[in-house]
Every structure is written in C-alpha cells, then in structure tokens.
C-alpha cells in the first residue's frame, strides 16, 4: 500500500460499481466508510444523466465497528429492495471495509430470503486487482449468475436468431466516449443489416441476459472489459468473439471484413459499399499533409493510456499519418505481454507503468512535438508547453461531451483527424488576446 498523488485506475470497488450502475434497474450497496463513497458524486458530475446514480453506501461507522455489520447491511439491502424494486442488488465492500474480514456472503444469503430482487456479492479480491479487472470480473459474474439461474429453470434461449446478430460487450458507465461509440457501432450494424441482439452492460436489464446465446457472434471493442464474459460464453455455447477496436481507416476496414466474414455476409455488393465508404475517408488525407508539413522532419509523438486505445492509435499514427512514435506506453500491467506484441514494430520505446512521474520524466527528456494520453498527460503537456490530445481514460468532464464525438467507425475517423489537426497545427497559433494584449 502506498500514498498516491494520482492513479490511472481506481480501486476494485469502483469497477464493480461501474458495471452495476451501467445496467438498468440494478442497485449497488457499497459496504464502506465515509471517504470511499465518492463514486456517486464522480459519476453524477461526469455522466450528467437525469437519474440518480443507483448506489447506496452502507456506512461503516463506530457503531458498526462495535456491533458488527450484519444488521445494518441486511437492513439496507431490504430497504432498497422495497424502495427501488430492482431486479438485482449487488453488494460490494471496499479495500478499507475488507479489513474487517466479515462473512458478507452470509449477509447476502440471509437478505435473499426476504428480498424480491436477486442479491449478489461481488466476487473480487480488493487487494489484488484494480478497477478495470474488477469491471471484467463483475460483468462475467453477473452474466454467469443469470445464465446458470435460467438454465436451471429451463428458460434460457439457445436457438440462434434467423438473421445475423451480435452481442456488443464492454460498453460501460464512465468509459471513454463509450455512449458515442455505441451509437456509431449501431449505425455500422444497421448499414450492413446486422441485428444487435444484446448490448451490455450499458443500458440493458439483467432479464435480457438469457438472450445472449441467441447471437451469432460477440463484438468486444474494448479489450479491457468483456474478455472473461466472452470466454465464458464461448465455453458454454461456442460463441466466437471479435476483439477489435475499429478506430482509424485500417482497423475499421479490418474490423468490417472480419465481422462480415464471421457472419458469412461477404459478397461483391457489400465489399463495394465498404470500398466506397473507405475512399470517402481517404479524402481526409489532406489533413495528414497539413498536420505534418510545417517542418521537414517527421513529427514526433508520445502515446500513453489504456492498452487497447494506445495500441490501436500507435498503429494509426505510424501507418496512416506518418508520425514517429518515440514512446508508447500503458498503465494496464495485466495486458503488458499483449501490448508489447502489438506495438513493438511501431515505436522506438515501450513503457509499462502506473507511475505518472515516470511518463512525465520521459516526456521532459524526449521533448515530443505532441502527446496523446490521459488527463494526467494533458496536465504534463500544459506544464511543459507541449500540445496533448486526450485519447484514453482516466479523463475529466471535457471528454464526456454532450455533442456526438465517437472514436470508432466512420465518424470516429473524423473525430481523430480533428484531434490530430488541432493538436499539431494550432499549438503555434497565438491566442487573439495575447496578440492584441496592448490594445485590449
């Protein structure tokens, strides 16, 4: 345990709460002391939704420490069951309350006897895994719970849909441009006449999870969230998964070809549509020329963030734009092997760390023309006078835009080109107020 000024990923209970609050009509009970209960405020501020965050804190106070938590936790579960009438209540401790070593599974079993909702204890180790790993684990646990429950009651849907269909897995609350990406992916599916069978966890109910086996294919745009679920569905039902982030021309084209091949939809007409769409995007090449023409030497970039976004963007900037990637890195240590394999041929140096001071020191030493990173790299860039485009969580409210800004699909290519053009070209333009300072 160490005191941290900045964390790229939060503690495990944040991951569990992200998944629980993504589902419709699911409520989370957080067994925690005051101070660990910042999730509600953070999510309300960033997501700006109409509804309240469905998370209640069962506060660990001096009375709980004296008498034990059982009565209070069970009372809170039953109270929320009566008030909110959810389909599922998820109980999670935090790393702090886990120190008490209480039998929370016993609390859940007792509460289930009098609760109309299903009650589930989040099965995560709060000392060994981080927010992203807890997201993945909690989603798999909820899917497994409802698959097994409905299999026992013989209500599980196993017959495939007549038309090609997919499950979209990994869209969650507080994800990087997740809601916009979902809309763009839905447009892609509609364009190629593919049915969206189920999108989870964001915006779906646990009752619809019985329909997961009906799909022909699982789509996982974000590698960090959904791999465990896809492995479980593959093991139980033989459902294959496509794990590609369709960001940029090359990856989008690769995604579409693999998607249509997997669904046996490839034909001359569809291939022609893909090529026409791709040609329109290639007309944006003038932005590439504008972005790199100001100096004769190649522009140098540093990229840091989540493994999936950084790996995809590194290839995009190197192959499609022609930037020299002098360093790329990730804070996802659990994905270090996969990440290194993906980027080793596209950058000069790889950095895998959760320490923001290491990336700050590298940026200061290497002096890139542009940075692409998280909110922390934005701060570092501002301090050093280097422009930064934000391409990955963790992020602040600027990167939860109300306007439509997907990072994937056809519109996502335009978003990335805007980000690239503004980051590279506008850094040397003087602000009007600075220019006319004496007059103003």
Swiss-Prot record:
Q: Describe which pathway this protein belongs to, using the record's wording.
A: Porphyrin-containing compound metabolism; chlorophyll biosynthesis (light-independent)
Q: Which reaction is this enzyme known to catalyze?
A: chlorophyllide a + oxidized 2[4Fe-4S]-[ferredoxin] + 2 ADP + 2 phosphate = protochlorophyllide a + reduced 2[4Fe-4S]-[ferredoxin] + 2 ATP + 2 H2O
User: What cellular-component terms does GO give this entry?
Assistant: cyanelle
Q: Where does substrate bind?
A: 427-428
The record ties this protein, via Pfam families, to: Oxidored_nitro
Q: How does it assemble?
A: Protochlorophyllide reductase is composed of three subunits; ChlL, ChlN and ChlB. Forms a heterotetramer of two ChlB and two ChlN subunits.
**Compartments reported by the entry:** Plastid, Cyanelle
Tell me the GO BP annotations in alphabetical order: light-independent chlorophyll biosynthetic process; photosynthesis, dark reaction
Query: Which annotated residues bind [4Fe-4S] cluster?
Result: 36
The uppermost taxa in this organism's lineage are: Eukaryota, Glaucocystophyceae, Cyanophoraceae, Cyanophora
Q: Does the keyword 4Fe-4S apply?
A: yes
Question: What InterPro entries does its record include?
Answer: ChlB/BchB/BchZ (IPR050152), Nase/OxRdtase_comp1 (IPR000510), Protochl_reductB (IPR005969), Protochlorophyllide_Rdtase (IPR016209)
Binding note for cofactor:
Binds 1 [4Fe-4S] cluster per heterodimer. The cluster is bound at the heterodimer interface by residues from both subunits.
Name recorded for this polypeptide? Light-independent protochlorophyllide reductase subunit B
Could you say which protein family the record assigns here? Belongs to the ChlB/BchB/BchZ family.
The EC code for this enzyme is 1.3.7.7
- Give a GO molecular function annotation for the protein: oxidoreductase activity, acting on the CH-CH group of donors, iron-sulfur protein as acceptor
Keywords from the named record: 4Fe-4S, ATP-binding, Chlorophyll biosynthesis, Cyanelle, Iron, Iron-sulfur, Metal-binding, Nucleotide-binding, Oxidoreductase, Photosynthesis, Plastid
**Which cofactors does this protein require?**
[4Fe-4S] cluster
Any idea what job this protein has? Component of the dark-operative protochlorophyllide reductase (DPOR) that uses Mg-ATP and reduced ferredoxin to reduce ring D of protochlorophyllide (Pchlide) to form chlorophyllide a (Chlide). This reaction is light-independent. The NB-protein (ChlN-ChlB) is the catalytic component of the complex.
EC top class, in one word? oxidoreductase
